[in-house]
Amino acid sequence: RQRQMCMRDSLFHCSGGKDRTGVAAMLILLALGVSDETICQDFVRTNVCRRPELEKIWAAHAEEIEAHPEQKQFYQGIAGVHPESAPFVLNTIRKEYGTTDAYLEAEYGLTPARLMRLRRMYLE
């Protein structure tokens, strides 16, 4: 119980702030019962936050992108995230496990009781 009380506020990040960290954030939001729509919106917010880096990359590779426009999407994946990734992850979880709660229990030991405890701790 004391350990749980100490873990109320948490911060996690990485230098890039996307990909694995983005999926980790998605899983936390899933555990809290957040809607798919909100999870997907949060995931693609990375592109807004990392827009300056993305524009620098596009500028540095402008000639290549002009010659091969598909490269713009490639660089999007380096500096940002592809919007279709979040729904793909959520759909894959449901396809493989039936429900997201079944996935969270099988892979992370988050039983229904633990999920309820997390939701009580972190949601108003």
Language-model segments: which ranges?
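Catalytic cysteine-centered active loop of the rhodanese-like fold, especially the PTP/DSP P-loop
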Residues: 8-32
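PTP/DSP superfamily signal
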Residues: 24-124
